[in-house]
């Protein structure tokens, strides 16, 4: 069962990684092609108006591809957050246990300090009472 869970996590992480690389590659390639089209140094047999329309259409398609890849990246981030929130009980339990241990240690330390202050105050109060009752100025 544990092995299947580990393999499932590995497969999911590989899937996330491949989606990330694919979307970034798509954004980069489309951006490079838009820049190439912006240079406008194509010597073709098409008329300038036809070439301009073709370049405009290709730029719009590539811009739409960049937007699609960006939306896919946002979905990927959302999926990763959801996965971590819903499935990462081990780290949540570790954090709770470590905080609990820290708070217990702090509580014990404070209790010891309070007891030391109590004992010092009791000893000082005893000394003051003894001094008061043995004083000639009462």
Swiss-Prot record:
Residues annotated as transmembrane: none
Cellular compartment(s): Nucleus
Single GO BP term: regulation of transcription by RNA polymerase II
Superkingdom, natural source: Eukaryota
Gene Ontology molecular function: any one: transcription coregulator activity
InterPro entries on file: Med22
Keywords assigned: Activator, Coiled coil, Nucleus, Transcription, Transcription regulation
GO annotations of cellular component type: mediator complex
Ranges in coiled-coil conformation: 13-40
Biological role: Component of the Mediator complex, a coactivator involved in the regulated transcription of nearly all RNA polymerase II-dependent genes. Mediator functions as a bridge to convey information from gene-specific regulatory proteins to the basal RNA polymerase II transcription machinery. Mediator is recruited to promoters by direct interactions with regulatory proteins and serves as a scaffold for the assembly of a functional preinitiation complex with RNA polymerase II and the general transcription factors.
PANTHER family: MEDIATOR OF RNA POLYMERASE II TRANSCRIPTION SUBUNIT 22
Family: Belongs to the Mediator complex subunit 22 family.
Protein name per UniProt: Mediator of RNA polymerase II transcription subunit 22
Protein's organism: Anopheles gambiae (African malaria mosquito)
Organismal lineage: Eukaryota, Metazoa, Ecdysozoa, Arthropoda, Hexapoda
